[in-house]
């Protein structure tokens, strides 16, 4: 005999299963996107200390998000935590080795520390994946100039300007090299 209590328990179980397998994942996805967007907006707005807090909060919940790690690494670089930035870029690369942005970001950190050969290696990797990546070409040109390889620097600045004609820094750097 089915009692009201049995029906109530069955409905409660159905509600719990629907919540666990349907509603909760949807809410989680929205929450994840909101956390990421908020941290990215704070970063873009130049509110770096707040952005770092938000990236930390995001990465506490989603520690295997390579894009989140790379973005937090960029914020860490801006606030002067170069080694922390390199750690984040290394983690991002280990999670998604085919994504090129963390290599560029790590190269910028290595330049800041005067680690020219490591920076050069990162930029060359990016160029091997995308020969028209003007950012990698420009940064590699900076490295070549830093080690007094002016002809190579000039050639790379020229390529960076060619692949992104609106990139005024590449043109002015080419003239100075």
Language-model features, listed with the residues they occupy:
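Helix-start (N-cap) detector for alpha-helical repeat units in TPR-like alpha-solenoids
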Residues: 32, 66-67, 100-101, 134-135, ...
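Register position in tetratricopeptide repeats
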Residues: 44-45, 78, 112, 146-147
């Amino acid at each position: 005999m089915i009692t009201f209590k049995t029906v109530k328990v069955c409905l409660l179980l159905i509600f719990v299963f629907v919540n666990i397998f349907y509603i909760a994942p949807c809410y989680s996805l929205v929450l994840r996107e909101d956390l990421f967007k908020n941290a990215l907006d704070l970063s873009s707005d130049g509110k770096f200390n707040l952005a770092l807090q938000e990236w930390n909060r995001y990465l506490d919940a989603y520690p295997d998000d390579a894009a989140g790690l790379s973005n937090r690494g960029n914020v860490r670089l801006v606030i002067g935590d170069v080694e922390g930035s390199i750690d984040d870029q290394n983690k991002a690369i280990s999670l998604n080795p085919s994504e090129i942005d963390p290599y560029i970001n790590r190269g910028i950190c290595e330049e800041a520390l005067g680690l020219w050969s490591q920076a050069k290696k990162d930029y060359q990797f990016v160029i091997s994946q995308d020969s028209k990546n003007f950012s990698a070409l420009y940064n590699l040109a900076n490295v070549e100039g830093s080690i007094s390889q002016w002809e190579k620097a000039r050639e790379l600045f020229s390529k960076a300007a060619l692949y992104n004609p609106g990139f005024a820094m590449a043109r002015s750097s080419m003239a100075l090299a």
